[in-house]
Amino acid sequence: MKNVMIVLFMLVNFAYNPGPLPAQAVKEIGRFGIALDEASFPQNSPENLRKSLLKAINSDKIEYMLAHLADPSFIDKNVREVHEGNFAKQVAETREKLKKGLKSPLESLLKEGKLNASEKSASLKDPALKDFIISMKLENNKWYMENNKK
């Protein structure tokens, strides 16, 4: 209901004042209707992104992880081209992959992986998980998990 009220406010505001959207309204609506929560899921450093990813997985906040912690351009393209614009299908697919065996190595890598970071990119690696790497990138002053499959 809160999101509906914000959208209505923005429409009325735009009709009478066609300028940029208020930053607070954009922040509350968020991506795919998922509000940004920088206090609970900080991503201002690779280490904080690591902790936020682990927290999102452990608390089953897959929607949040995909909307805000994963590479936005990859998620947008995947939702549009693979899931016919349906974000819920992307979330369901990711949940299914986690259930089918991805969750355990992902958690292990997020907890135990060695972080190698540069100014604009980072990666988590663990020799015990040979080919399993988490890549990260800095974009618009936020760190995101990148898709390794290009």
Predicted regions and their residues:
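Stable alpha-helical elements in mature extracytoplasmic
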Residues: S45-L53, K61, M65, H83, ...
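Short, low-complexity N-terminal intrinsically disordered segments enriched in polar/charged residues
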Residues: P18-S59
